[in-house]
Amino acid sequence: MPGIFIGKKEINVLEIGFGTGLNTFLTFLESQEKGLRINYTTFELYPLSPDITEKLNYPALIAPSSESIFALLHQCEWNQKIAISPLFTLYKSHADLTRTLSLIHI
């Protein structure tokens, strides 16, 4: 992880567009390797269907032992904070970020 995170024990991440879940998956793997607590929030207006996400082979190419985690990232409920591991929590918001921001006057 970049030097700006040296000495940090916890990081909050905001991702705009969950998409295939690759960024979330890579961040999860780093959190486990580095022992760093990550609170990961992602907004997605158009989630991919299970038919598509089940065909993604990122775990097989990157971390075969974590295939079940990749599946969990896609299967966990939207709009609920989920502890994927003791070091990684995920909040997937099925929402239009532009509408959300307008509601809080940003």
Set out the residue ranges of the language-model regions:
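SAM cofactor-binding core of SAM-dependent methyltransferases
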Residues: 11-71
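Conserved alpha-helix/loop element of class I SAM-dependent methyltransferases that forms part
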Residues: 1-10
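Conserved small/polar residues in nucleotide/adenosyl-binding loops
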Residues: 104-106
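S-adenosyl-L-methionine
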Residues: 56-102
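Short, well-ordered coil/turn elements that cap or connect secondary structure elements
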Residues: 8, 35, 85-87
